[in-house]
Curated annotation (Swiss-Prot):
UniProt-recorded name of the protein: Dihydroxy-acid dehydratase 2
Lineage: Bacteria, Pseudomonadati, Pseudomonadota, Betaproteobacteria, Burkholderiales
Protein's pathway: Amino-acid biosynthesis; L-isoleucine biosynthesis; L-isoleucine from 2-oxobutanoate: step 3/4; Amino-acid biosynthesis; L-valine biosynthesis; L-valine from pyruvate: step 3/4
Coiled-coil blocks: none
GO terms for MF: 2 iron, 2 sulfur cluster binding; dihydroxy-acid dehydratase activity; magnesium ion binding
């Protein structure tokens, strides 16, 4: 039986003789035209360590596709480095790159009638971009995560890239020596691989195991390790089998499997960006999913992993402790996982977990049983109030001050806020408001890791609030509220905040409130004028014109 269900449209018949001529130039033989064409969407790049180790994974996938009697077709996908672009205009391209990656993969797979696709990616937006494409295409596909970086070390202290961001604030506050500042800088990132805590890349890749679109154990492997290469090869082999069975992403990505994915995100203390990305993935898969669904999952799934940024350990520690399968098995046994959901292997998630022990190993303190959960409820909360009528996203577990009321310190751009923080003009009790940074206003919802890390480095992480219509890095922790909707650019209440206004952030009541009376707000609203777009041409202008609100995933199509 031939499995070239799609590629036959480009390789078969008299009219396709010119096509075959071009394939012969690529080294194809006559019998290859009856084999499935499998795309390898290769995100390798020397822009960032997150993607610098992907070529060997792509090569392994290519070899495995050939060994499975299919034709690999390699094409590139772009990336930017969130970590390097952080705090610059380049960060505005981060979320935009999610859409560009999805569009690139869709374009190549559809334009070439590929029968399946292996997506290989590393940096933060590679994961949602690839999964959005797979959900849109509904062509057999699998995600191969590039793997995590190993932790750095300086004077016996484990480091991640966030250590370097926080060192900026510590150094400028006089709390760190020049030697230690440079030591952290040089040693925070010792290998290839994505940022090591349960930040955005590891959050999304971990959730893909639960979603059923990546192989178990694959998300917590370190990029330099041979097992990561072996996993890439096995992923490609599994994908060819999925092509033969015609097992498609929408057979796997359902409301129930998204609930599984979000449950793992809650259990592991994952990134706020996952809220935005799963709204977009669900939209691409035509699954009914809203921000209220995150709140529903949060209330029933506890945090059972002690992982950075708010915890102690990194992804390699999680891997040694049993990885995501151990987390999944604990959730399954507790009735917090849909065990009947299909995975890319053709087996259910329950079948995949049958050999995983029900109790985590006693010689580790990364993963905890349900009855010893770190927090009884999840950490990613949806806050609402007159400052975020359509919702905002916050991490609320582990806060020493879960309720804060203070004066607004208002900034219409990130650099002004950084100058105020590093210039010691922010005080305990202040609430920073960074606005005009939403999907349309930024545009692109840039992440605010630089200012939040600087605040932490200054020793104000537990005493200063932070509100934005932009995003936060997966490495952010503290009293931070992002994704405020409606955003300032479209006239959301955040645009009406004035310097010194009283604001309340209440993690108990899930409240984000501007303490200004309705009459005054009405007066301000009548006087407000929408600013001119920051960009009038290029990809940022396109994104600003097309992007939906943050509470709808900031999708463009």
């Amino acid at each position: 039986m031939a499995y070239n269900r799609r590629s036959k449209h480009i390789t078969q018949g008299v009219a396709r003789s010119p096509n075959r001529s071009m394939y012969y130039a690529l080294g194809y033989q006559k019998d290859d035209f009856d084999k499935p064409m499998v795309g390898i969407a290769n995100g390798h790049s020397t822009i960032t360590p997150c993607n610098s180790g992907l070529q060997r994974l792509s090569d392994a996938a290519v070899a495995a596709v050939k060994a499975a009697d299919a034709n690999p077709q390699i094409f590139g996908t772009p990336t930017i480095s969130d970590g390097m672009s952080m705090g610059t205009e380049g960060m505005k391209y981060s979320l935009v790159s999610r859409e560009v990656i999805a569009d690139c993969i869709e374009t190549c797979v559809q334009g070439q009638w590929m029968d399946g696709v292996v997506v290989v990616g590393g940096c933060d937006k590679n994961m949602p971009g690839g999964m959005i494409a797979l959900a849109r295409l509904n062509v057999p596909g699998i995600y191969v995560y590039g793997g995590t970086i190993r932790p750095g070390n300086w004077k016996g202290r484990d480091l991640t890239i966030v250590s370097s961001f926080e060192a900026v604030g510590e150094f400028t506050a006089g709390r760190m020596s020049q030697e230690d500042f440079e030591g952290v800088e040089r040693n925070a990132c010792p290998t290839s691989g994505s940022c090591g805590g349960m930040y955005t890349a590891n959050t999304m890749s971990s959730s893909f195991e639960a979603l059923g679109m990546s192989l178990l154990y694959s998300s917590t492997m370190a990029n330099p390790d041979q097992e990561k290469v072996d996993s890439a090869a096995e992923s490609a082999r599994v994908l060819v089998e999925a092509v033969k069975r015609d097992l498609k992403p929408r057979d796997i990505i359902t409301k129930e499997s998204i609930e599984n994915a979000v449950s793992v995100i809650m259990a592991t203390g994952g990134s706020t960006n996952a809220v935005l990305h799963y709204l977009a993935i669900a939209h691409a898969a035509e699954v009914d999913w809203t921000i209220e669904d995150f709140e529903r999952i949060r209330k029933r799934v506890p945090v059972i992993c002690d992982l950075k940024p708010s915890g102690k350990y990194v992804a390699t520690d999680l891997h040694r402790a049993g990885g995501i399968p151990q987390v999944l098995k604990i959730l399954l046994d507790a009735g917090l996982l849909h065990g009947d959901c299909m995975t890319i292997t053709g087996r259910t998630i329950a079948d995949e977990l049958k050999d995983v022990p029900s109790v985590p190993r006693a010689d580790q303190d990364v993963i905890f049983p349900i009855d010893r959960a770190l927090y009884k409820e999840g950490h990613l909360a949806i806050l609402k109030g007159n400052l975020a009528e359509d919702g905002a996203v916050a991490k609320i577990t582990g806060l020493k001050n879960p309720v804060i009321t203070g004066p607004a310190r208002v900034f219409d751009d990130e650099q002004s806020a950084m100058d105020a923080i590093l210039g010691d003009r922010i005080r305990a009790g202040d609430i920073l408001v960074l606005r005009y940074l939403g999907p349309k206003g930024g545009p692109g919802m840039p992440e605010m890791l630089a200012p939040t890390s600087a605040i932490i480095g200054k020793g104000l992480g537990e005493s200063v609030g932070f509100i934005t219509d932009g995003r936060f890095s997966g490495g952010t922790w503290g009293m931070v509220v992002g994704h405020v909707a409606p955003e300032a650019f479209v006239g959301g209440t955040i645009a009406l905040v004035q310097e010194g206004d009283s604001i309340t952030i209440d993690a108990h009541r899930l409240l984000l409130q501007l303490n200004v009376d309705d009459a005054e707000l009405a007066r301000r609203r009548a006087a407000w004028q929408q600013p001119a777009p920051r960009y009038t041409r290029g990809v940022l202008a396109k994104f600003a014109a097309l992007a939906r609100p943050a509470n709808q995933g900031a999708v463009t199509g």
